[in-house]
Regions:
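AlphaC helix of the eukaryotic protein kinase fold
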Residues: 1-9
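Juxtacatalytic C-terminal regulatory tail of Ser/Thr protein kinases
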Residues: 197, 201-270
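Conserved short submotifs of the Hanks-type protein kinase catalytic core
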Residues: 25-39, 43, 47
Length: 286
């Protein structure tokens, strides 16, 4: 109910409309806008890397949607191509506002980090408080995949991918796709900075930069961080420190399946990671 009400309050041409919610017996439901189109992930699989201007257009529209949500103190927490619908006219709609928590309600929120490992921010993996910059990181990963045709970090399971989000730097997109120009590359990599303080601080700021890029105006974005400290492997307790942020451990959730719990608990690359318990978050996370 709470998530549906929050989603219903979001009005944007780039957010799937939520019209109503209700309960039928023991089942809650949400009445949402019907859309024709395909999800962005399927489009990337079919066509590969997108034109840089198209990447920026998609990024700008997602930024616009996130700006509306963030002004309502709502963090999406699951920005990924599967949650982006591409309409027949080429515009996009961000989906799953208001139902991400419902989908994962069988998993504990307090001591586990939930999210799709390929797109999750380092602080989400660590179980730290989330703000708008967490969604901006995930959007950066989406734009990276649009620009190159592949995700920046991959691995055998969700845990290994999540650790790479924390401990490794992405290959610059232009080294994968020579068609990616320096301006777009800097924008993408600034979104994906490990330290949230080094990213774009608001979705509006990112949108304005992307719109400048689309219009051919000068883009003033600093060079990305290319130095990272050493980090422990999966079984270690040592992780690199980001500025003055709190150190946190990332390790598989122990349980019936032992080390494979994270892999068996959920499908695909959506993982459950046990971390140090985060402080309370002022923002609503849906």
């Amino acid at each position: 109910k709470q998530e549906a009400q929050a989603a219903a309050g979001l009005s944007s041409p780039y957010i799937v409309g939520v019209y109503d919610w209700g309960k039928d017996g023991d089942t809650y439901y949400i009445v949402m806008e019907y859309l024709r189109g395909t999800d962005l992930k399927s489009g990337i699989k079919s066509h590969g890397a997108l034109d840089p201007k198209k990447v920026a257009q998609i990024g700008s529209q997602i930024s616009s949607a996130l700006s509306v949500a963030h002004k309502h103190e709502i963090i999406h927490r699951d920005i990924k191509p599967q949650n982006i619908m591409v309409l027949p006219d080429g515009n996009i709609k961000v989906m799953d506002f208001g139902i991400a928590r419902a989908k994962n309600s069988h998993l504990t929120q307090d001591n586990n980090v939930l999210g799709t490992a390929h797109y999750v921010s380092p602080e989400q993996t660590r179980g730290q408080d989330l703000g708008p910059t967490s969604d901006i990181y995930s959007l950066g990963v989406v734009m990276y995949e649009c620009a190159t045709g592949r995700v920046p970090f991959d691995g055998d399971d969700a845990i290994s991918v999540a650790l790479k989000q924390v401990n490794e730097l992405p290959i610059p997109p232009s080294q994968i796709n020579s068609g990616v120009d320096a301006d777009l590359e800097r924008i993408i990599l600034k979104c994906m900075e490990k330290d949230p303080a080094n990213r774009f601080q608001t979705a509006d700021e990112l949108r304005q930069v992307l719109n400048s890029y689309l219009s051919g105006r000068a883009v003033n974005v600093s060079e990305p961080t290319r130095i990272i400290g050493a980090a422990g492997d999966l079984g270690a307790t040592k992780t690199r420190e980001l500025s003055d942020s709190t150190r946190a451990m990332v390790r598989p959730v122990s349980g019936v399946s032992g080390q494979n719990t994270a892999r068996s608990a959920v499908s695909g690359s959506t993982g459950s990671y046990e971390v140090e318990k985060p402080k309370s978050n002022k923002n609503k996370i849906i």
